[in-house]
Amino acid sequence: MKNILLLGSGFVAKPALDYLLKREDYFVTIVSLFQNELDSITKGHDTSKFKTIQLDVMNKLNELEEYFPKSDCVISLIPATLHSTVAKLCIKHKTHLVTASYISDDMKALSEEAKEAGVLLLNELGLDPGIDHMSSMKIIDHAKENGGKVTSFVSWCGALPSTECADNPFGYKFSWSPRGVLSSATLSANFLWEGHNEEVPANIKWAVLQPIVVEDSNGVKMEFDGVPNRNSFPYIEQYNLNAKDVTTMFRGTLRWKGGFGIMIRALVAVGLFSTEVDARLAVEGGISWRNYLVQLLGCNDNDSDLLYCVESTIKEYFEKLKTERDGLQFHFPIIPRDIEKDVQHAVEGFKWLGLLSADEKVVNKNTPIDSLCALLEKKLSYKAGERDVVVLEHNFVVQYADRTEKEVSSLICYGIPNGSSATSLTVGVPVGIATELIADGKTTTRGVVGPVTPEFYLPILEKLKSENIEMIETKQEIKK
């Protein structure tokens, strides 16, 4: 019998657990503070195959130490800040570890110690990071083995409501706290595009959207706005590419065409992305969003004045962004904006959110952005029976001695209505598969690593196919 210790019971845990409990010779101990989540993710499973422990893992991890030496592998799905603490216990008891998170500096520092203990600390086993890196390295390694060199890499990834559920001005919904999404929306981006080092300031990132079309297996074209994602330069080294060969290195995020970028820019324009504590939010008896906007913008509290003030503030900000964007002379394709049309979309979005209504009360979270998050969490949540979709696409240009090819690797995965979301499936299932490989003794690498070598990515990607999570690969020669 193989024993697995699973820490955490969030939305990713169920697909990982479901995968592992398909094995008759696996026993899983699941630990979480939340008994309702433990009951939910284990519902329907044979009670002889698992054990649940209700415990505050974040503060009482030491109480679980006895389970580490008894386990063939530990899965950490608790907050990433605790992974290194879990890893130290794994090293102490010579037990392997799987996480879905990026390799932190604290985790990386444990690599030599883990090697000496004969322990594998395998990270980045989700979608992004995870499937994205594995599918990229599969193409890159295959190209190198056949004498090719990668000159261009463009990768897009998005987790979105499926088209029939994208029924709001954002074209987006949240299945967990919006704070992380909003925070990342205001980060700058750096990348290499056709030999040009592009630096996109945080404030104009959502004004430099690229038009992206991804075709599904039925030939249906899905239209997106693409936005650059943080710093793409480190991936030249991470993917073992020759910097002298690479002219384009870009990683970006997908949103449905038309809405999200407009709404983000408009909310920034009126000051709702501020992270400063604002005492006006804490007024006794509460404050409406309308009243708060009136105070933020300094206008009269009547419909015509407020509407004019909102429209003019957003328009002025959009024009400012366009001027700044045009002055930077970027070299990548950018969707031209109709400012008047975008302003009207934003205003209708404000009305839909209730920002112009005296009836929509602010849930005070001390800062404008956190109070906005509370509103978005209420308005942009998934309803019963709705599903999400994950879209991942890599585009490579590979030069061979006698030809140049465009190679595309793409994944479209839909969530299950009233079941696991596509996001949770594409994170939890890879975690489960990696755990199975380790527990079955099919890995030899030790230390702190991601799944970017054939030892990991080949079997994991192959097993994902049987779970209906498959990267479809195509190639086409580029005629000169």
Swiss-Prot record:
GO cellular component annotations of the record: cytoplasm
Entry's induction text: Down-regulated by phagocytic stimuli.
Any Gene Ontology biological process: lysine biosynthetic process via aminoadipic acid
Catalysis performed (reactions): L-saccharopine + NADP(+) + H2O = (S)-2-amino-6-oxohexanoate + L-glutamate + NADPH + H(+)
Alphabetical list of InterPro entries matching this protein: AASS, NAD(P)-bd_dom_sf, Sacchrp_dh-like_C, Sacchrp_dh_NADP-bd
Pathway: Amino-acid biosynthesis; L-lysine biosynthesis via AAA pathway; L-lysine from L-alpha-aminoadipate (fungal route): step 2/3
Class in the EC hierarchy, top level: oxidoreductase
Origin superkingdom: Eukaryota
Keywords, sorted A to Z: Amino-acid biosynthesis, Lysine biosynthesis, NADP, Oxidoreductase
EC number(s) per entry: 1.5.1.10
GO terms of molecular function: saccharopine dehydrogenase (NADP+, L-glutamate-forming) activity; saccharopine dehydrogenase activity
Protein family membership: Belongs to the saccharopine dehydrogenase family.
The protein's name in its UniProt record: Probable saccharopine dehydrogenase [NADP(+), L-glutamate-forming]
Organism: Dictyostelium discoideum
Gene: sdh
